[in-house]
Structure formats: C-alpha cells, structure tokens
Swiss-Prot record:
Residues 34-43 have a biased composition (Basic and acidic residues). Part of the 50S ribosomal subunit. GO terms for biological process: translation. This is Large ribosomal subunit protein bL31. The gene is rpmE. Residues 34-54 are annotated as: Disordered. It comes from the Bacteria.
Length: 73
C-alpha cells in the first residue's frame, strides 16, 4: 500500500435515535467526535415493518411518490 494516501482511522461515538451510544472506528470526523443518527435499524421503516413514517428530506419522498403514483394502478 502507498503511504500517506489513506484517511485517518480513529474512534468515534455513534448515537442512535433512542440515545444509545457505542464507540466504533471510522474515517468520519475527528477522534472523539459524535455522530448523531436520524434513522437507524431501530427506527427505519425497512426494519420496523413500516410503522414509522419516513422523513421527507428536501422533498425527495414526495417527488418520488408524485412521479410513480400511478405505476401500480
């Protein structure tokens, strides 16, 4: 491997939506930073059976629904 081309790999703290924290290694951020998740396996509709409502970030979900609204009719 070439030296000095890979990003720094360090410990960060990941905070789940329910407040649970765990430490993992990542290239994201700096040593000791906290990554707060908006969606995780405990709240994502794909893993919860769709009981949670999806957040529409920047109108992407509504644009998708509008574009494909008549697809299965």
């Amino acid at each position: 491997m070439k030296a000095e081309i890979h990003p720094d790999y360090h410990n960060i703290t990941v905070v789940m939506t329910d407040g649970t924290e765990y430490v993992t290694r990542s290239t994201w951020g700096k040593e000791g930073d906290k990554m707060n998740l908006d969606i995780d396996p405990k709240s994502h509709p794909a893993w919860t059976g769709g009981t949670q409502q999806m957040l529409d970030r920047g109108g992407r979900v509504s644009r998708f629904q509008k574009k494909f609204s008549g697809f299965l009719k």
